Amino acid sequence: MQRTCYIGELNASLVGQTVILQGWANRRRDLGGLIFIELRDRSGSIQVEVEPDSPAFHEADTVRAEYVLEVEGRFQPRPEEQRKGGLADYEVIALRVTVLSAAKTPPFELDKGESVAEDIRLKYRYLDLRRPEMQRHLMLRSRAVAAATAFLDAEGFVQVETPMLTRSTPEGARDFLVPSRLNPGEFYALPQSPQLFKQLLMIAGFDRYYQFARCFRDEDLRADRQPDFTQLDMEMSFVTQEDVLDVQERLLAHVFRTVLDYELPLPFPRLSYQEAMDRYGSDKPDLRFDRAFADVTDLFRGGEFGAFADAETVKVLAAPALTRKQLDELERVAKQNGAKGLAWARREGDGLTGGISRFLGEQAAALLERTGVEPGGTLLFSAGEWKKAVTALGAVRLALRDLFDLAAGGPRFQVAWVLDFPQLEFDEEAGSWTYMHHPFTAPRPEDIPLFGTERQGEIRAQAYDLVLNGFEVGGGSIRIHDPAVQTQMFQAIGLSEAEAREKFGFFLDALSYGTPPHGGIAWGFDRLVMVMAGASSIREVIAFPKNNRGVDLMAGAPSPVSPAQLAEVGVAVTTES
């Protein structure tokens, strides 16, 4: 027998008809001689009623949680007093119940999954994925893939797969290495991104490329990181930055409209990197709420309050009224992010009290005017070297968001572009310049003469990040297509011609065979779906993720391999004492 429909497809037009449904027993209860089974499939659930004189009763009496069933019965409305809306207004009166597969007692109650330790859920992921919430997340992901694919196909993009076994090249994180059995002592690397290959496809003349690319980075994990993850990777030839941003805005709006029935206003707001850091202390600001910083460096320059007078930057953030405990917690956040402390003062009437108020004097009135802090509200100050000061206060701003649910009053989704990143940043530990995005990012043409000068830190990149609700969900750039500029970039980061040729020789050769201007972007697809689904971690939108230690608890990976396997690929394992 084949089912007549999914449970979620049942509707009023089928009332009185006999239906065949297949799925899992969510729960079973006995009441007044009747057996009630809640039957679940990926589309929904419905109550099955089995009457004592039904030929289905004996089989139904054996059913326990998570048994796999086929139910044939009459679809009908429930008594009016029992209706709760939707499918809960209906039930199926069983004529036949067939147990297709029995089940052991699950290690946790599926309908209480959120209260179960995550490691247990991950160990029994195949059970965790039966939960309606998890199925909604993965089905949303599937619809997002389909929507993006349809849009890109219509825009003339060509889907091309790039190699999974490639050469190890420096991209910022550690590579996952794969020993070559046929070439002893040599290794492949799993790709951190398809960066060079997609640029080679532009050199090859494919004009517009995309793929849902699997990427691998051996780095420390956070709530929004996995060692293996998915990018929606795109590249376009003969384009300017504006061309790329236009396609991306229309693509993201299409995905949200198709999948969530949500309209993203176009065009997306834009901030420069400098503005984002200056106002929000982050290059991926959450713009669902404002709470921008005020710069008050000038109010304290040369003044008597030494902690602020000599600081490169003094920023202030207006916050609601805060308790001593809350202030202590926010100071802890500031210190975790590089600040020496978090100064504060409270508004009382037309003046300031508490904290550092006794040092403010004539600055108090100007502070109230610039910040617009509410009566009883608190001013939070961060002072010192610019990047440390704004970054610490940016972390405090996000802690305030979580403490007072500040984003709840804003739009459900807020997208923005962050542009004009620095091309280079100085690595204090190494004492040298390094790239901020990757070494193939094109600088602004007017800034190219600054390479090799004392002002090369001022070079702006033609780079752009796509930010959604405070998460970076995409990042890209216009690429260098002039071999001479690529050489200048390598020199700026201390890469000699010989080193560049050893690492990227095949790519540098390709650049010399006629390279079109080109640019692209990659979406962090797991992270995007996480935000769309309202999930707390990308592990909630990936079918079989690793935990925050990079371990697959279900399959038991990573795992030791036999000495014979190691010998076959010429690898010896040493353990540190």
Swiss-Prot record:
Function: Catalyzes the attachment of L-aspartate to tRNA(Asp) in a two-step reaction: L-aspartate is first activated by ATP to form Asp-AMP and then transferred to the acceptor end of tRNA(Asp).
Enzyme Commission (EC) number: 6.1.1.12
Keywords assigned by UniProt, alphabetized: Aminoacyl-tRNA synthetase, ATP-binding, Cytoplasm, Ligase, Nucleotide-binding, Protein biosynthesis
InterPro entries according to UniProt: Aa-tRNA-synt_II, aa-tRNA-synth_II, aa-tRNA-synth_II/BPL/LPL, Asp-tRNA-ligase_1, Asp-tRNA-ligase_1_N, Asp/Asn-tRNA-synth_IIb, AspRS_core, GAD-like_sf
Protein name as it appears in the record: Aspartate--tRNA ligase
Keyword hit for Ribonucleoprotein: no
MF (Gene Ontology): aspartate-tRNA ligase activity; ATP binding; nucleic acid binding
Record Gene3D superfamilies: Bira Bifunctional Protein, Domain 2, GAD-like domain, Nucleic acid-binding proteins
Taxonomy of the source species: Bacteria, Thermotogati, Deinococcota, Deinococci, Deinococcales
Residues noted as binding L-aspartate in the record, renumbered to the chain: 171, 217, 437, 479
